[in-house]
Structures are given as structure tokens and as C-alpha cells.
UniProtKB/Swiss-Prot annotation:
Family according to the record: Belongs to the ClpX chaperone family.
Protein name per the record: ATP-dependent Clp protease ATP-binding subunit ClpX
Subunit description: Component of the ClpX-ClpP complex. Forms a hexameric ring that, in the presence of ATP, binds to fourteen ClpP subunits assembled into a disk-like structure with a central cavity, resembling the structure of eukaryotic proteasomes.
Organism classification: Bacteria, Pseudomonadati, Pseudomonadota, Alphaproteobacteria, Hyphomicrobiales
ClpX-type ZB domain span: 5-58
GO molecular function, one term: ATP hydrolysis activity
Record-linked SUPFAM superfamilies: Glucocorticoid receptor-like (DNA-binding domain), P-loop containing nucleoside triphosphate hydrolases
Sorted UniProt keywords: ATP-binding, Chaperone, Metal-binding, Nucleotide-binding, Zinc
GO biological processes: cell division; proteolysis involved in protein catabolic process
Pfam families, A to Z: AAA_2 (PF07724), ClpB_D2-small (PF10431), zf-C4_ClpX (PF06689)
HAMAP family linked: ClpX (MF_00175)
């Protein structure tokens, strides 16, 4: 806006900031809008307010880092069980970001980064734990499949593509990406194919482990914004991986036999001792895991050395699977109930139906990952028929429905029943 000065000290038609009232002569820059003006000082003040609000988002302590107890409380809302793994992860993540928060304050002692290895059976929640952690800390997160990675120069993905995905999740903000979390799934599939080093080159196994060593420990990675192999002439972005937290996960099928057989002396003949088979569950055996077992499995010692924190997860029993179906904030039962609510229909499950679904998942040895496919199969016909039916108020699923002995029970509203009686 412009004002006419009567005092004679200010020239006529002087422009003023609409927010702080300073004149154009008191500030460096005055930006014009359709009907208002804003000065550079007010713009900087607004930016400071926005930055402070962004910093205060999420659960933060006075140091800007959530405590392990706060992390576990949020994890409990989404992930059922796995108390030991949650404790290990919450402490590791808290220490990692506390290290970053105090890095610039005291350079006398340099704290090393501690990456994490998650070991557990299929469908026990390894991937979901990592995803939930990234959401709690509010940092960029990306997930990579180790089975698609190969050494540079071979068909497949370079390990630098992992950093590219992290950069994309941070909207190409290099500073944010350098504080992110990378989860590498199926890391057990890049184990060495044999105990002894092979004469032929193992480009998808040991070769990938060797390629991952540097970015996991900390290096300046040259990342091509559009992917390396299709656009070789493009400029590279420099990303420091020193402060990126790497979490690796895998099912490690067969590792339990290596752990159980550790220290056994084999003998033959009549004097041979026969040891009873280990009847513990896989998750319980994993609690006795030592780094030497991973070396026997096929991971190279240098790779294991980059993963000092090992968290083992237990296989899920029926009670845990039933709780996974119904208790978390985004439980499967709640998801399907919400889906049915869109048709104005209430969906209910008997307790024995949930146990039958959990039992099917255990029989298939798919863990929590297999629950959705079982639910889809049970509700397929109902979801097909429901949009064309009128007056259905409620659908009830019993254990007989899960086992294929009966159809879901449809309960109609009274008005539809009255219409049917009149027409009859």
C-alpha cells in the first residue's frame, strides 16, 4: 500500500510493508502482491516459523530424538509381539539419531554408525518394523530388494540405485537423504553360493556383498539422477552415506540347522552319539545366533562386520496372528470392515473364525503375510454379490465359512423383509 506523508520527512507515495508497517526505505526489498506488500524481513520471519514447525513434527524429545520408550509405544500400535526385536531396534535408532544430533557439538570423540540386521522367519514383521520406524522418526525411507542387485557392469541394478531411491523419497533434497533409512530385504539371498570362494565370478551373491560394503560403512556415492545405465552422460549427485542407517533383513532359511549343529562333533560306528533333534521353534533357535553362523550360511565376514546389531524375530503363533488380524490400528479386519462400510454393510467375524484364519496361515507357513490372501479368498464371493444386493445390513463370518463348510450369513433390514412378505 502507499501512503501520502504530511510531515515532509517521507516522500509522497512511499510504499509500506502490509505486515510490519516499515517503509520501503527501511528494508532491503519490498515484494508486491495484488493489493499488499511484504518486506524481506517478514519473509525470513515466516520461513523461520515454518522451519520450527517442521522440526517439531513427530514425537521429539528436547534433543530432537524420540526416546526408546516412545519409539516402542508407537511400534506397539502397529506391530504385534516381537518385544525383543522392538527393544533392540528402538535403542539402535535412538542412539543413531542422537549421534547425529550431537555430531557437530563435540568432535573429540567420533561415534561409529551401527547398522542393523533383522533375522526372522517369513511373515514375522521385519519389513513392517523398518517402515514404521522411518515413519516415527520422520526421515526419508526406501526399501530395496537384494535379489535384484548385481555388481556394476552386469545386468541388474547397481547398489547406487538404492541411494537414488532414497534421494527420490527425499524429493532430491540431498541433506535430508543423508539422514534417511535404507531397508535391504532378502539379504539372505545374496549369500555366497559355496563355503569356499568360487573360481567363477559370483555377481549376484558375494559380488553384491562386496559392492554394499562401502555404501554401508560410509562413502561419497556418485548417484545419477536418472539411473546410471540408460543415461551415461548425465551429471552425478554426490551423496555422503556416512549417516544413512542401513537395516538388512532376511528369513535365512536353513540357518536354524547351522545354529543347532554348532559345536557338534560327528562320529561314526557303534560308539557314535545320537543327538535328539532340536524341537524348538525357528524363532527360539535364532536367539542363539552368533556371527560365525552367518559366515557358515554364506555372508562374508566384512559384510557381517558392517551389521554390528543383530535383532532376531520370533515366528508367530496362533494367538499372535489373531491379535494381528484384529488389534493394530490398520488391522486386516478393520480394513475389510471399512471396505464393507462403503456399501453400508456391517462385517463381523466370530472369534473362532479368526483362529481358523490364523491356523490356515500357520499351515501354509506364510506368517502374517499370508493373512490377506486367506481373507480375500473367504470374502471374494461376498464382495462380488454385495453391490447388487439390496437391504443387506450385516455379514457374519464363522469358522465354518473359513473352512468352506458354509456360506457367510447375510442379515437383511426389516424393510426389505416386509417388502418380500407383501409381494408373497
Amino acid at each position: 500500500m502507499s501512503k501520502v506523508s504530511n510531515s515532509g520527512s517521507e516522500p509522497k507515495n512511499t510504499l509500506y510493508c502490509s505486515f510490519c508497517g516499515k517503509s520501503q526505505h527501511e528494508v532491503r526489498k519490498l515484494i508486491a502482491g495484488p493489493t499488499v506488500f511484504i518486506c524481506d524481513e517478514c519473509v525470513e520471519l515466516c520461513m523461520d516459523i515454518i522451519r520450527e514447525e517442521n522440526k517439531s513434527s513427530g514425537i521429539k524429545t528436547r534433543d530432537g530424538v524420540p526416546t526408546p520408550q516412545e519409539i516402542i509405544e508407537v511400534l506397539d500400535d502397529y506391530v504385534i509381539g516381537q518385544r525383543y526385536a522392538k527393544r533392540v531396534l528402538s535403542v539402535a535408532v535412538h542412539n543413531h539419531y542422537k549421534r547425529l544430533a550431537h555430531q557437530s557439538k563435540n568432535n573429540a570423540i567420533e561415534l561409529a554408525k551401527s547398522n542393523i540386521l533383522l533375522v526372522g522367519p517369513t511373515g514375522c514383521g521385519k519389513t513392517y518394523l523398518a517402515q514404521t520406524l522411518a515413519r516415527i522418526i520422520d526421515v526419508p525411507f526406501t526399501m530395496a530388494d537384494a535379489t535384484t542387485l548385481t555388481e556394476a557392469g552386469y545386468v541388474g541394478e547397481d547398489v547406487e540405485n538404492i541411494i537414488l531411491k532414497l534421494l527420490q523419497s527425499a524429493d532430491y533434497n540431498v541433506e535430508r537423504a543423508q539422514r534417511g533409512i535404507v531397508y535391504i530385504d532378502e539379504v539372505d539371498k545374496i549369500s555366497r553360493k559355496a563355503d569356499n570362494p568360487s573360481i567363477t565370478r559370483d555377481v549376484s551373491g558375494e559380488g553384491v556383498q562386496q559392492a554394499l560394503l562401502k555404501i554401508m560403512e560410509g562413502t561419497i556415492a556418485s548417484v545419477p539422477p536418472q539411473g546410471g545405465r540408460k543415461h551415461p552422460q548425465q551429471e552425478f549427485l554426490q551423496v555422503d552415506t556416512t549417516n544413512i542407517l542401513f537395516i538388512c533383513g532376511g528369513a535365512f532359511a536353513g540357518l536354524e540347522r547351522i545354529i543347532s549343529g554348532r559345536g557338534e562333533k560327528t562320529s561314526i560306528g557303534f560308539s557314535a552319539t545320537i543327538k535328539a533333534p532340536d524341537e524348538r521353534r525357528v524363532g527360539e533357535i535364532f536367539h542363539d545366533l552368533e556371527p560365525e553362523d552367518l559366515v557358515k550360511f554364506g555372508l562374508i565376514p566384512e559384510f557381517i562386520g558392517r551389521l554390528p546389531i543383530i535383532a532376531t524375530l520370533e515366528d508367530l503363533d496362533i494367538d499372535a496372528l489373531v491379535r494381528i488380524l484384529s488389534q493394530p490400528k490398520n488391522a486386516l479386519v478393520k480394513q475389510y470392515q471399512h471396505l464393507f462400510e462403503m456399501e453400508n454393510v456391517e462385517l463381523t467375524f466370530h472369534e473362532d473364525a479368526l483362529r481358523a484364519i490364523a491356523n490356515k496361515a500357520i499351515e501354509r507357513k506364510t506368517g502374517a503375510r499370508g493373512l490377506r490372501s486367506i481373507m480375500e479368498k473367504i470374502l471374494l464371493d461376498t464382495m462380488f454379490e454385495l453391490p447388487a444386493l439390496e437391504g443387506v445390513q450385516k455379514v457374519v463370518i464363522s469358522s465354518d465359512v473359513v473352512e468352506g463348510k458354509a456360506r457367510p450369513l447375510y442379515i437383511y433390514s426389516e424393510r426389505v423383509e416386509d417388502k418380500e412378505n407383501v409381494s408373497a
